[in-house]
Amino acid sequence: MPGEAPVEDYDPKEIEPKWRERWLEERKYRFEGGEDRPAFVIDTPPPYPTGELHMGHVLNWTYMDVVARYKRMCGYDVFFPQGWDCHGLPTEVKVEEIHGITKRDAPRREFRKLCEELTLENIRKMREQLIQLGCSIDWWTDCIDYENEELKELGSYVTMDPDYIRRSQYGFLELLEKGYAYREEHPVNWCPRCETAIAFAEVEYVTRETYLNYIEFPVADGDGSVTIATTRPELLPACVAVAVHPDDDRYSDLVGKKLVVPLHERFGDRDTPWEVPVIADEEVDPEFGTGIVMICTFGDKQDVAWVKRHDLPIVRAIDEQGKMTEVAGEFAGMEVEEARAAIVEALKEEGYLVKREKITQNVGVCWRCKTPIEILVKEQWFVKVRELAEDVKEAARKMVWIPEHMRKRLEDWTESMDWDWCISRQRIFATPIPVWYCKECGEVIPAEKDQLPVDPTRDDPPVDECPKCGCSEFEPETDVMDTWMDSSITPLVITGWPDEEPDLPVDLRPQGHDIIRTWLYYTTVRALVHADTEPFKEILINGMVFGEDGYKMSKSRGNVVEPTEVIEEYGADALRYWAVSSGAPGSDVQYMTKTIKRGYRFAKKIWNVCRLAKDHIDDAPSVEEVEGDLTPADRWILSKFHRLVDEVTEHLESGYRFNDAIKAIEEFAWEELADDYLEMAKLRLYRPEELGEGSREAARAVLRHVLDGLLRLLAPFMPFVTEELYYRLFDESVHDQAWPEASEKWIDEGVEEVGEILREIVTEVRKAKTDAGLRMGAEFEGLTVHVQDEELAESLEKAIPDLKSATRAKEVEVEVGEPKLERVPVKVEPRMDVIGPKYRELTRDIIEYVENNPDEVASAIKEDGKAKLEIDGEKVVLDEECVDVEWELRVKGGEGKAVEIRPGVVVEIRGLST
């Protein structure tokens, strides 16, 4: 295969599997870790193992793979690891669905084993898909000491392996030691479907229609009532106060009084009275509803703030399954939506419901299952992130953000946090929280670091008796950690922590903008706590992917396109082309089949160029060796190529502007190299006996030089086709080559100006051939280029072989001086549809006259706007509507078509005929 000419047709189905297999066999992209090259470390996102890559993955991994391949070519020893973020609720839900069970139906250990088996199967599928995409991942360098050999082959780390669990638990213990982790009873976001606490960063907000219910609250110990508007009447059993704005004159007399909670007779018993105080608070919005609000435990974050600020009691009206508790009386046991409807009906029956208004509101939902969240008071584990807010913002300023404006998302999120990070979850498939509790006094007994990993539900605590009270009985922690506790230590783990000092910041974090407030935020917190530094030097952000219909891809909309199907039809290079060309980093992009097809056509174009060039560039000399024989076209393409190297390098070095880089490469390869230069060089390559051996050698040298560099520039973006072609042309791997360097020696604006004139001349000849109905390769008599500038004339004289080759003119001349131009009619056609109705019986004679005297008629129309004739004694006037005249510019006295392509440059084309 090496050294062979590319076969006739480009077929990615033949090329890509071969190189995927070979790269794996050679362990081509393994990180060496030596002293001879600087390291470049990527903190690759560990995807959740769903079993299928989606187009968002394709976008993200293509971005990071382009960086990895580019940096290797720039001389870096690139560490491009791949981990897997295994734990989490979606796997538990899928296991329940597959096996027809719930987590309560199986022993804890067996349920976890089912989750691990499914995860292992999914990782294997996704690993193959990443390989299929052409990602130059290091599958051979382990970041953890695998205990499970079955997991070892799947990536650099797998978070469900015992050693990763050890590292995650180590981090928890360090947070506890440093005073950042704590446990307390506190309101938390709770998902009734998942039956677990979730962090604020895991709450999404969606717009939904609901009703604003206006409810009468009687005034206690007096006459009258006030109307309060609420969207959550089901929380009436948990109403502990009502609030007004202190400057709202409508309710100034109410402050200090009490109101009676409607329907309280139908609710259950509670420790706090059903007469609730009216308080004043500046955070009440006088414009919402009636300007008076009920404070319930808890409707939203604002309720939590008011309860804390005014030391109000807490009533638990909703349980962990999202059902009403006993305090709701006859409504107990109902799910929230059912209770809402029933209580509204009861309010209507009792005469408390004044009216209802349909409104839209933002509702917080679980980001996994989209169930509306509740705020419940639970004892949970937290990490103190609020006190690190300024440190996080300072760290964010030290990191380079691509694009820069994405930093504000992190800063805005940091400033918006009211609560600490809740890290405990009431699930099974996750890292166990490594603590026990004294059965007598509740003292927290953390594991020792040297006994990690531990599962408190199976393992014994590190002490025989409680250090506080002496009790010898302990209860295990059954909660597990938030999965972000696992993934937020990835830059630490890939640099050896906690067994070695972590080498932070790593060079690059590539990720989506949708997880800035989670993965990126939490990772920054952990790096600050565990390593006292920011985690990354650069952050490369990718956007979301939308379907061809303009909507976010989703199975419910039916607009999902599977990456594997695209690869099977068009190849991975075409899919990667879509990823890099569709938009700038950080921007949302649209999947477009036409872009995939363009990528395929571009690969095919490069293939065909190399196929044509193969026989001519073997053993070609260097451009320096043939410098004296270089034509203006040679120098033009060399200048354009070296300018391209500068441009593409700048795009990649200044913000990873992949879309600008691939656009520049494509325009050069397709338009300047393939469409123009090759046409200018073909005759020199194929007919050295006519144009000289030196001219042929120059063309061979230039073609080799440019193709060598072009394949290198394209290699990070389209690694398969470039590898195949580079091996066929140069018998080496393109991915082992250095990144091209631009040489100022070859960049010359004057040369480029001459080259553009050559292109314009060729374009005009092609147009003329098209108009004449000739094929592009047809030979014709000749062309003369008239120029006024002697220096330009000298350059064009040297370009005669280029022009002959590109135009197929038998003779090419260059003349200095300003030619005299004239417009001559080349087609004069009388219009019977206009002349007939106007002149009737004279029509035949008029047409005959025009056909016999075309120049006379055309000249008259040109000069006077009309031709005056006398036919059979009658006056006839023909204007532009009566006669179609097609003019052609010519050099006076010449026979060929002339075109003024720019001031001072006229091309005369002779002898074009069908």
Swiss-Prot record:
Oxidoreductase as UniProt keyword: no
Gene Ontology molecular-function annotations: aminoacyl-tRNA deacylase activity; ATP binding; valine-tRNA ligase activity
Keywords annotated in UniProt: Aminoacyl-tRNA synthetase, ATP-binding, Cytoplasm, Ligase, Nucleotide-binding, Protein biosynthesis
Binding positions for ATP per the UniProt entry: 555
Cited HAMAP family: Val_tRNA_synth_type2
Function: Catalyzes the attachment of valine to tRNA(Val). As ValRS can inadvertently accommodate and process structurally similar amino acids such as threonine, to avoid such errors, it has a 'posttransfer' editing activity that hydrolyzes mischarged Thr-tRNA(Val) in a tRNA-dependent manner.
Disulfide bonds: none
Entries under Pfam families matching the protein: Anticodon_1 (PF08264), tRNA-synt_1 (PF00133)
EC number(s) on file: 6.1.1.9
SUPFAM superfamilies: Anticodon-binding domain of a subclass of class I aminoacyl-tRNA synthetases, Nucleotidylyl transferase, ValRS/IleRS/LeuRS editing domain
Subcellular location: Cytoplasm
Entry comment, domain topic: ValRS has two distinct active sites: one for aminoacylation and one for editing. The misactivated threonine is translocated from the active site to the editing site.
PANTHER family membership: VALINE--TRNA LIGASE, CHLOROPLASTIC_MITOCHONDRIAL 2, VALYL-TRNA SYNTHETASES
The protein's name in its UniProt record: Valine--tRNA ligase
Primary localization: cytoplasm
Gene Ontology CC annotations of this record: cytosol
The protein's enzyme class: ligase
Motif position, 'KMSKS' region: 552-556
Motif annotated as 'HIGH' region, chain positions: 47-57
Similarity annotation: Belongs to the class-I aminoacyl-tRNA synthetase family. ValS type 2 subfamily.
Record field: catalytic activity: tRNA(Val) + L-valine + ATP = L-valyl-tRNA(Val) + AMP + diphosphate
GO BP: any one term: valyl-tRNA aminoacylation
